[in-house]
Amino acid sequence: MSEEIKKFDVVFECDAVNPGRMRTDMKVRMLEPDPFECELATDEMGFHGGDGSAPTPLMLFSGGLAACLMTQLRAFSKRLKVDVGEIKLATRLHWQGVQKGREPYETEPVSFEIDIDMEGSASTQQRIELIEAAKKGCFVEQTLMRPNIIGHRLKVGNDWVQV
């Protein structure tokens, strides 16, 4: 007896506006599987010319990684019937930037670390299997683990130019 294989799409869109300072206001829409829309904002701290009026983009990124993995841990603990009780997760994301004179800096990731603490009666092996399943189901972690091509276009008049 073969199990049914289901495929599903998860699709987001975001419209972002930056009126001239470091703050960016965004309307983020989940189109699939369950339509939902919210407004978010980012800003930079004073050292980068911002006002600190909202979380920095990397704060949202770090929180997004933590929340995505946490969601999968909780969802899969229920699906796999693994008793883990309360779950605590801590991330440490480290990048390094290099700048020559006044030129724009270039950045690269140095290390991303995630510490997970679970309560409950699950064995160590069950916890490891749960974490492995959650890693595979975490959209953010899977995106980070693969080479990705990100398309960029610039609007020029009424046309779009590939960058």
For the regions a protein language model found, what residue spans apply to each?
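Extended beta-strand/beta-hairpin segments
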Residues: 1-63, 74-163
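Alpha-helical metal-binding/catalytic segments enriched in His/Glu/Asp
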Residues: 68-69
